[in-house]
Curated annotation (Swiss-Prot):
PROSITE patterns, sorted: RIBOSOMAL_L1 (PS01199)
Protein family membership: Belongs to the universal ribosomal protein uL1 family.
Subunit structure: Part of the 50S ribosomal subunit.
Entry's Gene Ontology cellular component terms: cytosolic large ribosomal subunit
Protein name per the record: Large ribosomal subunit protein uL1
Pfam families: Ribosomal_L1 (PF00687)
Organism name: Ruegeria sp. (strain TM1040)
C-alpha cells in the first residue's frame, strides 16, 4: 500500500494547479503519470448541457478512432443463414439466433458489441432489459442493426467507439492506451470530441460542451480548454 500511496501522491502533485489544458498538454500529462504495471486506458469524460430525459436532447453516435482503442473487442452477432456465415468470416466472436438469446437470458454476456440483422430484432427485442442498461442493444442509429454485417463487425474490431449521454448529460469513453504514442492519443481525442460536437441535438439549449476531463484508469483527471478542444 505504501508504494501505491507514493504513486498516487506523485500523480496528484503533477496534476496540482493544472487545468484548461490543450489536448496535447493533457495527453502528455496523463500519459506521463500512468505508471501502474498494466497498460492503463486513457479515458475522456464530457459534461454536456443536455437533459437526457427529453428525446430532443439525447446525444448518441459512433466514431471510428483513427488509431483504434487498443482494446480487443468481442463482437456478438444475431443473424441466420448466409448473414451468420458472413459474420463469422468477418471475425465475429459469437454468432447465433434464439440460442444466443437464451445464453444471454441465462446471464452470460461475453461481448463488448452486439450487432443484429433487421429480421432478428423481434428476437433481440426480448433482451432490451438486459442489453439496454449495458449500452449493448443493437440500434440502427449507430449502425448495429444492419444487413452489412461484414462492415459492422470490421468497424467494431477496428476501433469504432459508440457514445451515449447518460444521466446528467455525461458522455465517456476510452480513447486509447497509455502505451500509445502521444500523437496517436491526441488524434483519437480530437476525433472523439469532434464526433460529440457534431452530435449536438436540436433541443440543446445554452452551452453544449461544459467540461472535458482526460484521465487514465488509475490516475487523476485534468480538465481541457473546451473552446480550444472543440476548435482544433
Amino acid at each position: 500500500m505504501a508504494k501505491l500511496g507514493k504513486r498516487t501522491r506523485a500523480a496528484r502533485e503533477a496534476f496540482a494547479g493544472k487545468s484548461n489544458l490543450t489536448i496535447e498538454e493533457a495527453v502528455a500529462l496523463v500519459k506521463a503519470n500512468a505508471t501502474t504495471k498494466f497498460d492503463e486506458t486513457v479515458e475522456i469524460a464530457m459534461n454536456l448541457g443536455v437533459d437526457t430525459r427529453h428525446a430532443d436532447q439525447m446525444v448518441r453516435g459512433v466514431v471510428g478512432l483513427p488509431n483504434g482503442t487498443g482494446k480487443t473487442m468481442r463482437v456478438a452477432v444475431f443473424a441466420r443463414g448466409p448473414k451468420a456465415d458472413e459474420a463469422k468470416e468477418a471475425g465475429a466472436d459469437i454468432v447465433g439466433a434464439e440460442d444466443l438469446m437464451e445464453t444471454i437470458q441465462g446471464g452470460t454476456i461475453d461481448f463488448d458489441r452486439c450487432i443484429a440483422t433487421p429480421d432478428m430484432m423481434p428476437v433481440v427485442g426480448r433482451l432490451g432489459k438486459v442489453l439496454g442498461p449495458r449500452n449493448l442493444m443493437p440500434n440502427p442509429k449507430v449502425g448495429t442493426v444492419t444487413m452489412d454485417v461484414k462492415a459492422a463487425v470490421e468497424a467494431a474490431k477496428g476501433g469504432e467507439v459508440q457514445f451515449k449521454a447518460e444521466k446528467g448529460g455525461v458522455v465517456h469513453a476510452g480513447v486509447g492506451k497509455a502505451s500509445f504514442d502521444e500523437a496517436k492519443l491526441v488524434e483519437n481525442v480530437r476525433a472523439f470530441v469532434s464526433a460529440v460536437a457534431k452530435a449536438k441535438p436540436s433541443g440543446a439549449k445554452g452551452a453544449y460542451m461544459k467540461k472535458i476531463v482526460l484521465s487514465s484508469t488509475m490516475g487523476p483527471g485534468v480538465t481541457l480548454d473546451v473552446d480550444g478542444a472543440v476548435s482544433e
